[in-house]
């Protein structure tokens, strides 16, 4: 760990020290300009060449109608969703992976290493396969009983299917240590979630939202809702919106897992989401430089206008509603922002527009039934009622009526 700075410098090709300033500050905008040698237009071209981006912006007419009927009184903002599941690896993470892996290839690295238990690993494996690079994905997967979460095991399957080597670890601090060891031993590129390239790759998402809203609706969205964990999603999306000249409000959304500790062996398998929750969202929002690079390019507090919280049960409910009402079966974690948008819609006038900026693919381990069954096996009750009574790690409360959805901050 004492050699972290030199290992990371060799593994990403960035000298972070030149962006430091007196008093513990650093020049964020200079870092983003100089560490990403591509314009937004060039990034769009790079991603397009890797079958990433230009995903559809879909109007959720039936979900919107449900919000309007439930709210009444002229409330119920129109809800649209950016169907990022259309990307080659099945999520918006393909955008950040495409640019990161492209940079690794451009700089002559023979392979890439990514520390992630989520969709990013599959995205890096996918892009590495397209560019002929080796890939190692490091997952925090098991508790001390060697019991792994179904969602993470699903990602193992996806990564290995695309030729990646998957290193699986138990919960705890060894993830970053093992990643540093692998970077040093292999000389591979650190395809971190938090490099400037990884964040710049998401800017195309915000830019597309603005362009597509103008084309389809003749206006910018009033609100864009982004699921928040490490902060890259909202940072990149907001930067892209700004580059498109949009003045939309940008809201973060996370699943409320208050009381659970993400490094706790006991708590690890008592949560249903590996990302997009407060266990990552809150710490990385207030202290972003707790990552595998010296300075995190994801700075959510610079860009979020509000931080909304949803309950686990609400996300599962909305996942089922999206499939039943719109014919879109998508992964639960990607519907965190949709659950927040549904609650928000019922508080806004019907002439306003909310864009949910992602969906993700679903699979056997990511499906709600797999996750709810796993929760029950780990002592978590699955109930139907008022989500306000939900206690993370003890129960999951599915709403008994759509009016139960609430805006929380």
Regions found by a protein language model. Give the residues of each.
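Buried hydrophobic positions in well-ordered alpha/beta secondary-structure cores of metabolic enzymes
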Residues: 56, 81, 93, 118, ...
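A short, small-residue-rich loop immediately preceding and capping a beta-strand
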Residues: 104-127, 131-141, 220-236, 333, ...
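Active-site/ligand-binding loops adjacent to catalytic centers
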Residues: 54, 176-184, 243-329, 371-409
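Small/polar-residue-rich loop-to-helix segments that shape phosphate-bearing ligand pockets
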Residues: 136-220, 256, 262-309
């Amino acid at each position: 760990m004492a050699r972290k700075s030199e290992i990371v410098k060799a593994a990403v090709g960035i000298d972070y020290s030149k962006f430091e300033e007196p008093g513990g500050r650093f020049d964020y905008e200079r870092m983003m300009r100089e560490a990403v040698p591509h314009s937004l237009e060039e990034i769009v071209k790079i991603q397009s060449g890797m079958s990433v981006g230009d995903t559809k912006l879909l109007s959720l007419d039936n979900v919107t109608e449900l919000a309007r009927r439930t709210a009444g009184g002229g409330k119920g903002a129109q809800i649209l969703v950016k169907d990022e599941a259309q990307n080659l690896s099945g999520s918006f993470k393909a955008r950040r992976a495409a640019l990161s892996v492209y940079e690794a290839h451009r700089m002559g690295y023979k392979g890439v290493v990514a520390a992630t238990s989520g969709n990013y690993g599959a995205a890096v494996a996918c892009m590495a396969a397209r560019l002929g690079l080796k890939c190692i994905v490091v997952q925090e997967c098991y508790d001390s009983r060697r019991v792994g979460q179904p969602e993470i095991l699903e990602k193992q399957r996806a990564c290995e299917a695309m030729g990646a080597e998957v290193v699986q670890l138990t919960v705890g601090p060894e993830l970053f240590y093992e990643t540093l060891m692998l970077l040093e031993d292999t000389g591979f590129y650190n395809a971190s979630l938090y490099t400037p390239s990884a964040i710049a790759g998401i800017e195309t998402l915000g830019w597309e939202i603005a362009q597509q809203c103008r084309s389809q609706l003749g206006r910018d969205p009033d609100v864009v809702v982004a699921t928040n964990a490490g902060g890259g999603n909202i940072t990149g999306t907001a930067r892209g919106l700004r580059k498109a000249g949009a003045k939309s409000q940008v809201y973060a959304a996370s699943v409320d897992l208050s009381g659970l500790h993400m490094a706790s062996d006991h708590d690890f398998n008592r949560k249903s989401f590996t990302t997009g929750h407060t266990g990552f969202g809150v710490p990385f929002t207030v202290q972003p430089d707790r990552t595998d690079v010296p300075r995190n390019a994801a700075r959510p507090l610079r860009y979020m206008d509000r931080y909304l919280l949803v309950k686990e049960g609400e996300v599962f409910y909305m996942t089922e509603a999206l499939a039943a009402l719109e014919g879109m079966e998508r992964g639960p974690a990607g519907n965190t922002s949709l659950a927040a948008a549904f609650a928000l819609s019922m508080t806004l006038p019907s002439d306003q527009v909310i864009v949910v900026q992602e969906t993700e693919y679903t699979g056997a381990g990511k499906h709600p039934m797999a996750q709810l069954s796993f929760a029950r096996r780990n002592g978590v009750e699955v109930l139907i009622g008022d989500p306000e009574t939900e206690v993370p790690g003890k129960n999951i409360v599915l709403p008994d009526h759509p009016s139960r959805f609430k805006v929380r901050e």
